[in-house]
């Protein structure tokens, strides 16, 4: 934080020491990333260090920008499917959150696939619950 790193940068840089990689220390409820978030909020406050997150546009506005940039919702669907083929589910989840605000019915199945996959891969019960909660039935 004192070096000017953003929260996202810190989340990628900090890892637990190898001696904590023990079967009896596996976290099943929480996640190490969530602990980093808590420390950031305690000492750094609510600002993530990323200027675009200071006063962000709505997900609806971002979703429209993604759809326009792709040349339409069908092109964006193809792009997202290519991300999934490359196993880039987290990247796809950022986009699907925004475009689902614009076209929830059109992207519902893809959104459900993304969050179902992420939930299945997640060891943290907290993250698993959040991913599953966002699956539309």
Q: Language-model segments: what does each one mean?
A:
Residues 1-137:
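Accessory terminal helices/loops
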């Amino acid at each position: 934080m004192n070096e000017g790193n953003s929260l996202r940068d810190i989340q990628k840089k900090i890892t637990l020491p190898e001696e904590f990689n023990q079967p009896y220390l596996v976290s099943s409820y929480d996640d190490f990333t969530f602990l980093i978030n808590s420390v950031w909020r305690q000492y750094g406050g609510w600002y993530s260090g990323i200027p675009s997150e200071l006063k962000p546009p709505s997900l609806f506005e971002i979703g429209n920008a993604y759809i326009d940039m792709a040349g339409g919702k069908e092109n964006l669907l193809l792009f997202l499917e290519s991300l999934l083929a490359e196993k880039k589910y987290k990247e796809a989840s950022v986009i699907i959150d925004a475009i689902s605000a614009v076209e929830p019915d059109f992207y519902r199945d893809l959104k459900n696939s993304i969050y179902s996959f992420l939930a299945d891969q997640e060891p943290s019960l907290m993250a698993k619950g959040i991913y599953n909660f966002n699956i539309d039935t």
